[in-house]
Amino acid sequence: MKHFVDSLSIVKVNGFDNVTSIIDVGTGAGFPGIPLKIVFPEIKITLLDSLNKRIKFLNAVIDELGLENIETIHGRAEDFSKKEDYREQYDLCVSRAVANLATLSEYCLPYVKVGGCFIPYKSGEIDEELNNSKKAVQILGGKIEEVVKF
């Protein structure tokens, strides 16, 4: 239950009600992408993961739940972010438990449209990691607007 609640916690973020497309990088078992799709069926969701067995599992879950307008991609985040069909195509990029924040920013920010948002789900004490990521975020054209702790 905790994973579902955590997945939906981003709806409190300013501007979420304008989101029409989300990419979930390193989706794993589909968190937060699948719960977001269930609650917000109108949002286009892309689930990206490097392990094909996870993608096969997610496809089975999507079929079983009858979810529509949701895409799964087997591939590496750093490779797909260079492809024109995915680069700067999403209002929101989310990711949880994938990498440190500097690396994660390099993977995820290229997917976000100008004016969009990247929300990394992080746990524990993140102040040092946040500080270490500031340069990468700036180089990639992003800025840290808010840190929300749940």
Each model region followed by its residue ranges:
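Active-site capping/gating segments
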Residues: 125-150
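Class I SAM-dependent methyltransferase Rossmann-like catalytic core
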Residues: 1-2
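Helix-to-beta-strand junctions that scaffold the AdoMet/dcAdoMet cofactor pocket
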Residues: 40, 112-114
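Short glycine-/small-residue-rich Rossmann-like dinucleotide-binding loops
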Residues: 97-98, 123
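Conserved beta-strand signature within the Rossmann-like core of class I S-adenosyl-L-methionine
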Residues: 115-125
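Conserved SAM/SAH cofactor-binding pocket of Class I
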Residues: 5-97, 105
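Conserved beta-strand segments of alpha/beta enzyme cores
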Residues: 44, 69-71, 117, 143-146
